[in-house]
């Protein structure tokens, strides 16, 4: 029998801020889902990826996938 894969799914959430028509600052709400091996990577993931809501590359930080 094969071993179970140890990788977990994590959510990478955009840190970009979008200003609404009323002047409020809100998160864009855009995210990516990635696999991560907790045995090899102990730090939280951070990537610079494209956010289509703000149309630029921004920092994405790891959050818990619900």
From Swiss-Prot:
Q: Source organism's superkingdom?
A: Bacteria
Write out the entry's keywords from A to Z. Answer: Ribonucleoprotein, Ribosomal protein
Asked if Ribosomal protein is a keyword of the record, the answer is yes
GO CC terms in record? cytoplasm; large ribosomal subunit
Under the heading Pfam families, the entry gives: Ribosomal_L33
Gene Ontology MF term list: structural constituent of ribosome
**BP term (GO), one:** translation
Which PROSITE patterns does this UniProt record tie to the protein?
RIBOSOMAL_L33 (PS00582)
- UniProt family annotation: Belongs to the bacterial ribosomal protein bL33 family.
**Annotated protein name in UniProt:** Large ribosomal subunit protein bL33
| UniProt source species | Wolbachia pipientis wMel
Gene name of this polypeptide: rpmG
């Amino acid at each position: 029998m094969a071993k179970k894969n140890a990788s977990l799914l994590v959510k990478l959430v955009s840190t970009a801020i979008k200003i609404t028509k009323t002047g409020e600052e809100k998160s864009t709400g855009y995210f990516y889902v990635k696999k991560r091996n907790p045995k090899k990577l102990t730090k939280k993931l951070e990537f610079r990826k494209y956010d289509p809501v703000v149309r630029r590359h921004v920092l994405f930080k790891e959050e818990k996938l619900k």
